[in-house]
């Protein structure tokens, strides 16, 4: 590869302040000048290319505009001593494909690299970046954004539908475009009663089976479904249907395909310098060097890019444990302690605090959610109070315990009663989201309905029981696509969900109907979401009835005027004349019953009011006597 003796670039349109803040790690809009941008210099229109490669000897831009030839005029020039390179190419234009040819200064070895800041890329297996300057879109979601800025999600409903775009639905066996999805997805989510959709990663990734969690193009919209404008149109349509959009975001590690970020200038650049810290053996990826200023700029600017350019309402941050712990998924001897001898990743902790601090300061109403499975404290505590600053944390403990419980034969559930009650011991330590995500319905774990115990009737009943219990449990909610109609096969990323079963089988149609009614019930009852993180909002009636495997508890609204009594029967036994303590004297009415005939249940519902009597029970001065249907959740409400 030819070496070019570079000279200081005097024609760069990049401001000195931008350069300063970029190298200081404080620039949060680096995408505005890094990568490929339309420019007019000396009266000539073209594209200015800028990248960061501190150990490069030379960088040449090749592409459609120069027939992919290395030419002297297309070599970048260094604009700082810290590795910022730039060049203006007059005849480059929107839609041209390009790559960087990066030569290392010590070895003279060169590699062909995609642009880390490219806004669009070729569909796999091709790997070139694509100049994308026509990204303007006229949004129509002003009312949504105004509402978002004023919303406190802690005391509002939040019921999330997690979605993998490529396999939700296909068209003639092919990926649906963002525009095609705009015609069906918003309406479906609205009709089903979900408040938010959570997209699994939408940035470019080479391997379909990675589901987007091993990205190469952090700024590149997933080209499988169309272009930038198409995605903006989809988000706009969702917002106009009062549906929030959360994006899975992967700031901890990246794909090690050679065209990507790995050894970008021939040396560790975006990854840690220490090989042991850089290598992520578990996932076959490289870990970001979260202590390096330019890497922090790359990532925090990326978060800002998705939020500002695509009006994303929240980021679910993937694999937070991998960011927090130096010894995450590593044996002794495979990790390097921090300067104090501990296993905490000090750079990762600082990065997460800075990320959340920036977003809180600049993006009103945008939420961040931690996918984190350890007992690290104060994840959802504000940064100024010593926490990491996330708004929410997935409750992985609740998920693991309750899925284990619901898979047990009811005969043995009484010996494992703590699995279904333990979550309330620690619930108020974080702002939890109860999540049944994609990770729980793949790799031999079975689909959600297939995790349920028993024959077909009991599986459907168990699913209704479990989901009703989940709706009653404090915390926001998340469910993965396909669970809402009881798909029996595990999720497969290479094919669409089995929607045909809804038309073919009454049981699946009834299950879909159940989820819609349950979601509507959740949304309409303030007691179910107004005090999720306030002790006032939840009270046990009886948490200790392990012998009958029955749970009972109260959910209350802020003003205490709305109270719901949940009774969950985790056995296939009908209980007659069951005495239950209640907080208030008066008349109680059934407002939800998962055993309803319209859901596919046995139809053991209470059509008449139930009057309390002045008899002590479960620590209350009043009690009611009820019939509890089998494998069902019963919800009562005081009406007078």
From Swiss-Prot:
Q: How does it assemble?
A: Monomer.
Q: Output the CDD domains linked to this UniProt entry.
A: AmyAc_Glg_BE, E_set_GBE_prok_N
Which organism does this sequence originate in?
Francisella tularensis subsp. novicida (strain U112)
Q: Where is the active site?
A: 318 (nucleophile), 371 (proton donor)
Q: What name appears for this protein in its UniProt entry?
A: 1,4-alpha-glucan branching enzyme GlgB
Q: Which gene encodes it?
A: glgB
Which UniProt key words apply to this protein?
A: Carbohydrate metabolism, Glycogen biosynthesis, Glycogen metabolism, Glycosyltransferase, Transferase
Which InterPro entries does the entry link to?
A: A-amylase/branching_C, Branching_enzy, GlgB, GlgB_N_E_set_prok, Glyco_hydro_13_cat_dom, Glyco_hydro_13_N, Glyco_hydro_b, Glycoside_hydrolase_SF
Hydrolase in keyword set: no
* Catalytic activity reported: Transfers a segment of a (1->4)-alpha-D-glucan chain to a primary hydroxy group in a similar glucan chain
């Amino acid at each position: 590869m030819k070496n070019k003796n570079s000279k200081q670039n005097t024609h760069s349109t990049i401001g000195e302040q931008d350069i300063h803040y970029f190298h200081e790690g404080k620039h949060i809009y680096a995408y505005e000048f890094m990568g490929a941008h339309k420019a007019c210099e000396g009266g000539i229109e073209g594209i200015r290319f800028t990248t960061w490669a501190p150990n490069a000897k030379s960088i040449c831009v090749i592409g459609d505009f120069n027939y992919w030839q290395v030419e002297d005029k297309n070599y970048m020039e260094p604009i700082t001593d810290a590795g910022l390179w730039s060049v203006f190419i007059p005849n480059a234009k929107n839609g041209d494909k390009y790559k960087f040819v990066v030569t290392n200064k010590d070895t003279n070895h060169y590699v062909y690299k995609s642009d880390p800041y490219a806004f669009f890329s070729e569909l796999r297996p091709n790997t070139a970046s694509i100049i994308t300057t026509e990204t303007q879109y006229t949004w129509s979601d002003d009312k949504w954004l105004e509402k978002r800025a004023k919303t406190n999600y802690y005391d509002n409903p939040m019921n999330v539908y997690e979605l993998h775009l490529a396999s939700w639905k296909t068209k003639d066996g092919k990926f649906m475009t963002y525009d095609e999805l705009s015609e069906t997805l918003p309406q479906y989510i609205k009709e089903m009663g979900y408040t938010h959709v959570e997209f699994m990663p939408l940035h470019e990734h080479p391997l379909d089976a990675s589901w987007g969690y091993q990205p190469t193009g952090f700024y590149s919209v997933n080209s499988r479904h169309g272009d930038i404008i198409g995605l903006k149109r989809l988000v706009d349509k969702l917002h106009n249907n009062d549906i929030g959009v959360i994006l899975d975001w992967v700031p901890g590690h990246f794909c090690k395909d050679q065209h990507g970020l790995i050894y970008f200038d021939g040396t560790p650049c975006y990854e840690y310098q220490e090989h042991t810290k850089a290598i992520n053996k578990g996932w076959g990826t490289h870990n970001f060097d979260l202590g390096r200023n330019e890497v922090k700029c790359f990532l925090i600017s990326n978060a800002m890019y998705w939020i500002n350019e695509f009006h994303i309402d929240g980021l679910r941050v993937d694999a937070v444990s991998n960011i927090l712990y130096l010894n995450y998924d590593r044996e002794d001897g495979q990790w390097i302690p921090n300067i104090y001898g501990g296993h905490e990743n000090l750079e990762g902790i600082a990065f997460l605090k800075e990320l959340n601090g920036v977003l809180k300061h600049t993006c009103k109403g945008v939420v961040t959610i931690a996918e984190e499975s350890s007992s690290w404290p104060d994840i959802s505590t504000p940064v100024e109070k010593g926490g990491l600053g996330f708004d929410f944390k997935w409750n992985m403990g609740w998920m693991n315990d309750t899925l284990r419980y619901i898979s047990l034969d009811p005969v043995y559930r009484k010996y494992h009663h703590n699995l279904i009650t333990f979550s309330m011991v620690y619930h108020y330590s974080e702002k939890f989201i109860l999540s049944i995500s994609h990770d729980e319905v793949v790799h031999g774990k079975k689909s959600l309905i297939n995790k349920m115990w028993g024959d077909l009737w009991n599986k459907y009943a168990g699913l209704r029981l479990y989901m009703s219990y989940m709706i009653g449990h404090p915390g926001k909610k998340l469910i993965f696509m396909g669970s809402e109609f009881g798909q029996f096969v595990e999720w497969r990323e290479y094919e669409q969900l089995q929607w045909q079963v809804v038309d073919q089988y009454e049981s699946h149609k009834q299950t879909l109907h159940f989820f819609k009614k349950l979601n509507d019930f959740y949304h309409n009852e303030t007691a179910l979401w107004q005090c999720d993180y306030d002790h006032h909002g939840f009270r046990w009636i009886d948490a200790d009835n392990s012998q009958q495997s029955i749970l009972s508890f109260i959910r209350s609204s802020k003003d205490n005027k709305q109270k719901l009594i949940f009774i969950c029967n985790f056995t296939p036994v009908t209980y007659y004349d069951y005495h239950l303590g209640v907080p208030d004297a008066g008349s109680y009415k059934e407002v939800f019953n998962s055993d309803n005939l319209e859901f596919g249940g046995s139809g053991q519902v209470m059509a008449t009011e139930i009057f309390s009597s002045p008899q002590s029970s479960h620590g209350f001065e009043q009690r009611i006597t009820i019939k509890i249907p089998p494998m069902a959740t019963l919800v009562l409400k005081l009406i007078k």
